[in-house]
Structures are given as structure tokens and as C-alpha cells.
């Protein structure tokens, strides 16, 4: 959606409210997944998926990052939480599966950006073997070439390569 506000925080609030209007279940599931709490909603078979998630992302770390963030960033994060929570307040017919109140630290669960680590490449079965009754076999993959990078289309341009003489970061 196109959202306009007098401040950046106003725009964040409006964007999250609009996103919840479009698909609150997806918004909530994204954060349930990020917190490694899917098994609480979908059942025990998701426990190892949650474990894998928690090996990479830590809610306590997200809270710590939020607490030490500059005031301008805290305002944006609070606007995120306020936008989702206001949506829930004004739509009592919407019943969250797990998260009844969104917190301003939650966006830091995604602080790696879209080009961060790909936890899906870590085998849930290997995690089950390691923590369960099975044994883990070490695998060494030999490659003659580097693996193809995966992620978003973000890239940087050095000042010497730009017409303006300025560095550019395109995300």
C-alpha cells in the first residue's frame, strides 16, 4: 500500500495497520515463526523447526537491541507495535492464534535483512538426529567452485563507479 504520514512513525503505523487489514494471519505467523513458536500453534511436529529458528534468532537479543537503539529507531518500532495493536483493538472479531499484543522489539527478529542467513538450508532431520535418539553423520561437501549466492537483489556501487562520485547502496 501507499501510506503517507506527517512523520516516519506515522507512516510505519499506517503501513502495519494496512498490512493487518490485508492479511493479519500472515503478519502474525511471520512473527510466530521468527520467535520459534510455531509448535504452539501447529503442533508438536514443528518442535524441531522451532529449535532451528531459535538457534539463529533470539528474542532476548531482539529486546536488548531495541533497548539500546537510538530514540528515532525506537519511535519507528513503537509505531510498528502500535499499528498492529490498534488494528487488533479495532477489529475484535480477529482472534490471534498466539500473539495478543505485539511488542516494539519484534522487528529486530528480522534484523539480518533479506540477504541474511538462510536457515532453511539447515536440515530439520539433522537437528532431530542431533537432539533426538539418532546419531549424526558428518558430511563434507567438496566443491570445485563457490556456491551461487542466494538472497535479494541488493548491491553496492563504489564512488569511483558512480556518475555522482557518491557511494550507493541499492536494496
PLM region descriptions:
Residues 171:
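Extended polysaccharide-engagement surfaces of secreted carbohydrate-active enzymes
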Residues 2-168:
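Substrate-recognition/specificity elements adjacent to catalytic centers across diverse enzyme folds
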Amino acid at each position: 500500500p501507499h501510506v503517507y504520514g506527517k512523520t516516519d512513525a506515522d507512516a510505519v503505523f499506517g503501513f502495519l495497520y494496512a498490512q493487518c487489514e490485508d492479511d493479519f494471519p500472515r503478519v502474525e505467523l511471520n512473527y510466530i515463526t521468527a520467535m520459534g513458536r510455531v509448535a504452539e500453534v501447529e503442533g508438536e511436529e514443528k518442535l524441531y523447526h522451532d529449535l532451528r529458528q531459535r538457534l539463529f534468532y533470539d528474542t532476548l537479543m531482539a529486546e536488548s537491541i531495541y533497548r539500546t537503539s537510538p530514540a528515532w529507531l525506537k519511535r519507528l518500532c513503537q509505531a510498528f507495535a502500535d499499528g498492529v495493536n490498534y488494528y487488533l483493538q479495532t477489529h475484535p472479531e480477529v482472534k490471534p492464534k498466539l500473539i495478543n499484543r505485539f511488542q516494539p522489539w519484534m522487528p529486530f527478529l528480522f534484523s539480518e535483512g533479506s540477504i541474511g542467513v538462510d536457515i532453511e538450508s539447515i536440515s530439520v532431520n539433522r537437528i532431530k538426529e542431533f537432539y533426538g535418539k539418532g546419531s549424526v553423520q558428518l558430511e563434507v561437501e567438496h566443491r570445485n567452485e563457490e556456491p551461487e549466492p542466494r538472497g535479494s537483489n541488493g548491491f553496492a556501487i563504489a564512488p569511483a563507479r558512480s556518475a555522482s562520485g557518491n557511494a550507493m547502496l541499492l536494496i
